[in-house]
UniProtKB/Swiss-Prot annotation:
Ranges of biased composition (kind: Basic residues): 385-397, 414-428
Ranges where the record places region G3: 651-654
Pro residues biased stretches: 110-124
Name the UniProt record assigns to this protein: Translation initiation factor IF-2
Pfam families xref list: EF-G_D2, GTP_EFTU, IF-2, IF2_N
Gene symbol of the encoding locus: infB
Location (main, coarse): cytoplasm
Keyword Cytoplasm in annotation: yes
Lineage: Bacteria, Bacillati, Cyanobacteriota, Cyanophyceae, Oscillatoriophycideae
């Protein structure tokens, strides 16, 4: 035997114990096991059995309600309803003198634990009829069990009708039993506290049955709202209510309860006695055992009073299916127990009324009990767990039972059919019995359960609370809920896919072609699949992939193939005003503001000099090459009609590269001054400035400068401007023209007066009492101050400390400096200031706004920076004029040349201008790749980047950081510095041409005419006269006859006066011989040339 192995779960079945109990015993005996499936030796199994028997005896003594070994046996048989079996069996063997605790009695004991739902008086009556001697010991044990159960049951005053019958029949026995019960109750009260953990386990099993106690009030009356509810509660609580009552309360009130209950219960015990003389004793034992598990159930009911009646009803129905004899036996015990608890008495008063109303129902209960006794208890036990699960159908039945008992019987038959579908016919019988038990159980259980729950024992810890009761239903509910969202998602996907399918077939009728696009972008615009475009191009002999960029010609070819009309977008002028700085809230607080005047014109026409003469400063002398290369903002105070007026001037560059700057200046200005030199006339940048001003819809004032020069001709300027629709006022037009001399300061006052008059007509106004808004005029990175931006405030007031967002750049203003270098605390509308405190250099032309909430400002800046990053990526992908697919092939063939540049300038506007000019250079053979373009000084980081990529560093009006020059010398990096933009552009173009391979060019040397032909041997020699240039031996020659080339070859021999000569100059005669050509004729023309390698220039092809 020692070699044989035993599984833990097999041993638990044999001992009718839980696997958990067996594992605990193994831990106590130091037997190493991992789980219920672990194997142990036969000797270890014997040790466990012995230990289990000891524990069962101990538990039986402690808890007469059935928390001992029999409990484990009952659990094994009542697996599904572990609560009933576990607690009742230990009490039965212990209480019954007839049967030992052995396994032999476990089977009969199994039956009584199920009936604990309804104890009936026949048990005491039977004991009296059969034999007082046997009954007395049984009664004592029953009393002890009953006392323990009664303590638990006493709160269940609804069972009083049955209990009252028992005391009347067994008054003498009850006196003895009460004394014994009092003793047992004291012992049990201590033992119950110690074994609360065990009861909690049983309660966990029963939680499903105990789903809802009627009410948690400590008093019984509160728990009994109505007879119908009481009935339901009784049906649900019979097993639960008994175990809940505390032993102390039972002792104190046992006598009173006994006196109250005996009157009504006598007839029921008589029936039981007649049916089974010996069964009542067993049933009593079973009842005593069952109530203790019921107590546990009640405690759980107290904890979980809100459980649905549906869940409780299935449990109660199962309990009701148990033999009624056991219930009757329990009832007398409950009567004794109920006598003891006095506190439940006040609630019992309403209970008595309810009991009187329900007194009619006991007969039905007895009948159903008799039927149940005839049935096999084991079958009922096995059926109980199955019945517990179908809670929803039972709920409907209960409602029917409460309202119409007759209809419920019919419903039970239907329910029985449904139960048969579950495999067991027994379920039908149990369902039929449930009707009778519901009324009685509801009456008996409702009130006492609430009291017992509150008084019997403290609530079990959450960890001990059984989740099994709701598991079945919860799992059933959760599963569909989990599946439902999945189904919903799949349904949503299908819908979205259907929508996409419907949308795709709709092709676009027109295509706005504003930029190059990838295959994917074009497919989205046209509303077709990418494969369709790839197929079209494939048939045209062009292989592309989905991410490849298509040029305009290819896109047009695809559109024609698909019969889609191409439209070119309307090009908006760069100077068009896009944002209105004033909103509706500002209309009530508008104040006049100074005008913003932009000085525009062709390069070297005297714009900056004119501004200097107005401001009485010397800005132009500091400009490199005498040309303005970034916007300057200046304030001028002027006296007009005795008032101090202010004008803000913006000086824009006139060089062609600074188109964006001029457009930006026109966009933020109120009045445009067009400066035209009287000695130079209208130039291209003059026309551009006019177009910018008109796009911005600002009035134009023409200043004809340099009238002090003798060659000046103002009338010619007026004539040229009138051709551009700028007709002077003296000629009947509307354009104000003022001849001025910037150097001598002539007519400057007249010009300023004209500006103020135009400003008055425009009624310029702003709201200074709001947060500032405006435009970034210029921005740069200062080596000491960090990012610096020149802002023009167009509305509101800008103050130090404001949180500002300029495009994607966030910052908090640390300082503001005006045009003369003075620090200011605030800037009112129309004033331009430099600010410090930005975290990056903003782009010139970006609009800025001040926010009160920094969090909101940061969110906006982050969103803009993300959008900007995306647009830059798209531009980088489409900027190359050679597609990525052909890039590698050309690079391998050596046809592709790239010039990598790193551009650093003083301000953002200069960077913008240089990049715009670089794009205008022809890049068919050499492409310019600008790796980095930013304002600021040249740093070592830039040198490292250039070394890694082979780039050239170009600096414009900037300096080198410390260490940058030394690092560049070590790495051999070329750093070019410029202060005039057109020199920078010329050098970059020369560098691009230097990357091109030199080409072989034909260089003519001389021309000779054939005067005579001399045959020599097999060949012939041409006597020639050199007409121009010179003839050199071993050079290329071309023979022309009557204008047509008849031969090209090499001049093999050249003789002068019968001697070989290396070359012959013009005006001399010579003989020319060619080895492969002898067909000379007089009058032929011989052209001599050589091939020379020449540097190529950029072609615009």
């Amino acid at each position: 035997m020692s070699n044989s192995k035993v599984r833990i779960y097999e041993l638990s079945k044999e001992l009718n114990l839980d696997n958990k109990d067996i594992l605990e015993i193994c831990d106590q005996l130091n037997i190493a096991v991992k789980s219920h499936s672990s194997t142990i030796t036969e000797s270890q199994a014997e040790r466990i059995k012995a230990k289990a028997e000891k524990l069962n005896h101990q538990m039986a003594g402690k808890i007469h309600s059935g928390s001992g070994i029999d409990r484990g046996q009952n659990l094994a048989k009542e697996r599904k309803q572990e609560i009933l079996a576990i607690h009742h069996k230990p009490n039965r063997p212990f209480s019954s003198t007839d049967a030992p605790v052995g396994s032999g009695q476990s089977s009969p004991l199994i039956e009584p634990p199920r009936p604990p739902m309804k104890p009936q008086p026949p048990s005491p009556s039977r004991s009296e009829v059969t034999s007082p001697i046997t009954d007395e010991p049984v009664s004592t044990q029953e009393d002890t069990n009953g006392s323990s159960s009664s303590h638990e049951r006493e709160p269940q005053s609804p069972m009083s009708p049955f209990d009252q019958q028992q005391p009347e029949q067994n008054t003498t026995d009850h006196n003895q039993e009460q004394q014994n019960q009092l003793k047992y109750n004291q012992e049990q009260s201590n033992q119950l506290e110690q074994e609360s953990a065990i009861s909690s386990e049983l309660s966990e099993v029963n939680v499903s049955k105990l789903l809802r106690p009627p009410v948690r009030p400590s008093e019984k009356p509160a728990s009994v709202p109505s007879p119908s509810k009481e009935k339901e509660a009784k049906s649900n609580e019979p097993t639960k209510a008994q175990p809940i009552i505390s032993p102390k309360e039972n002792k104190s009130h046992s006598k009173e309860n006994k006196l109250k209950l005996p009157s009504d219960i006598k007839p029921k015990p008589n029936k039981d006695k007649d049916r089974d003389g010996k069964k009542p004793d067993k049933e009593k034992d079973k009842k005593s055992l069952s109530p203790q598990p019921k107590v546990k159930r009640e405690s759980r009911e107290q904890r979980e009073p809100r459980e649905s009646r549906e869940q409780r009803e299935p449990r109660e129905s199962r309990e009701q299916r148990e033999p009624r004899e056991s219930r009757e036996q329990r009832e007398p015990k409950l009567s004794t127990e109920l006598k003891r608890p006095t506190p439940p008495k006040p609630p019992q008063k309403p209970k008595q009324a309810e009991v009187a109303a329900l007194a009619i129902e006991p007969e039905d209960v007895e009948d159903t009990a008799e039927d149940l006794l005839e049935e096999d208890p084991l079958e009922a036990l096995t059926q109980k767990p199955k019945l517990k699960r179908p809670t929803p159908p039972k709920v409907g039945k209960r409602q029917n039972w409460d309202e119409e008992e007759e209809e419920t019987e019919e419903g039970k038959g239907k329910a029985g059919k449904a139960a048969k579908a579950g495999k067991n016919k027994r379920r039908q019988l149990l369902l039929e019995d449930e009707d009778d038990f519901d009324s009685d159980l509801e009456e008996i259980l409702e009130i006492p359960t609430a009291v017992s729950i509150s008084t019997a024992r403290p609530p079990k810890p959450k960890s001990m609370k059984p989740a099994a009761s709701g598991n079945g239903a919860s799992k059933n509910v959760k599963a569909p809920t989990k599946a439902e969202p999945g189904r919903g998602k799949s349904a949503e996907r299908e819908r979205s896919e259907r929508k996409d399918r419907k949308e795709q077939p709709q092709r676009a009728e027109t295509l706005v072609l504003d930029k190059t696009m990838t295959v994917r972008e074009l497919a989205e615009r046209l509303g077709i699949a990418e494969t369709e475009i790839i197929r079209i191009l494939f048939f045209k002999g062009i292989a592309v992939n989905i991410t490849q960029t298509l040029d305009f010609d290819t896109i047009q070819a695809i559109a024609e193939e698909l019969e889609v009309q191409i439209e070119s977008p309307e090009v908006k002028a760069a100077a068009t005003k896009t944002t209105e700085m004033l909103d509706a809230n500002d209309l009530e607080n508008l104040h006049r503001r100074p005008p913003v005047v932009t000085i525009m014109g062709h390069v070297d026409h005297g714009k900056t000099t004119l501004l200097d003469s107005i401001r009485k400063t010397k800005v132009a002398q500091g400009e490199a090459g005498g040309i303005t290369q970034h916007i300057g903002a200046y304030h001028v105070d002027i006296e007009h009609e005795g008032k101090q007026e202010q004008i803000v001037f913006l000086d824009t560059p006139g060089h062609e590269a600074f188109t964006a700057m001029r457009a930006r200046g026109a966009r933020v200005t109120d009045i445009a001054i067009l400066v035209v030199a009287a000695d130079d006339g209208v130039q291209p940048q003059t026309r551009e400035a006019i177009s910018h001003a008109r796009a911005a819809e600002v009035p134009i004032v023409v200043a004809i400068n340099k009238i002090d020069k003798p060659e000046s001709n103002p009338d010619r300027i007026k004539q040229e401007l009138s051709e551009l629709s700028l007709v002077p006022e003296e000629w009947g037009g509307e354009t104000i023209m003022v001849p001025v001399s910037a150097l001598k300061g002539e007519n400057l006052d007249t010009l300023l007066e004209m500006l103020l008059l135009v400003a008055e007509v425009g009624e310029l106004s702003a709201n200074p009492d709001r947060l500032a808004r405006g435009t970034v005029i210029e921005a740069n990175l200062d080596r000491t101050r960090g990012p610096v931006a020149t802002l023009l405030v167009q509305n509101g007031t800008l103050r130090v400390g404001d949180t500002i967002v300029a495009g994607p750049v966030l910052g908090k203003i640390r300082a503001m400096i005006d045009d003369r270098g003075n620090k200011v605390e605030e800037a009112s509308p129309s004033f331009a200031v430099e600010i410090l405190g930005l975290n990056e250099v903003p782009a010139a032309g970006d609009e800025f706004e001040v926010f009160e909430n920094e969090k909101e400002a940061r969110a906006l800046a982050d969103q803009r920076s993300q959008d900007l990053r995306q647009t830059r990526l798209q531009q980088a992908m489409s900027s190359r004029r050679i597609s990525l697919s052909t890039l590698s092939a050309q690079a391998q063939e050596g046809k592709l040349k790239e010039l990598n540049l790193i551009l650093k300038a003083d301000v953002q506007g200069s960077v913008e201008a240089i990049l715009g000019s670089l794009k205008q250079l022809p890049q068919n053979e050499v492409q310019i790749r600008v790796l980095l373009a930013a304002p600021g000084e040249i740093t070592e980081t830039d040198v490292d980047l250039a070394a890694a990529s082979g780039a050239v560093i170009v600096g414009f009006n900037t300096t080198l950081a410390s260490g940058a020059r030394q690092s560049a010398d070590q790495e051999g990096i070329d750093i070019r510095e410029y202060n005039i933009i057109y020199k920078l552009l010329d050098d970059i173009q020369g560098a691009m041409e230097g990357l091109l391979d030199p080409e072989e060019v034909e260089s003519p040397l001389g021309v000779a005419e054939v005067r005579a032909v001399f045959p020599v041997g097999r060949g012939a020699v041409a006597g020639c006269y050199v007409q121009s240039g010179k003839i050199i031996r071993n050079r290329q020659l071309r023979v022309r006859r009557k204008g047509e080339v008849i031969y090209e070859g090499v001049l093999d021999s050249l003789k002068r006066m019968k001697e070989d000569a290396r070359e012959v100059n013009a005006g001399y005669e010579c003989g020319i011989g060619v080895s492969k050509f002898n067909d000379w004729q007089e009058g032929d023309s011989i052209e001599v040339f050589e091939m020379v390698m020449k540097r190529r220039t950029l072609s615009t092809k």
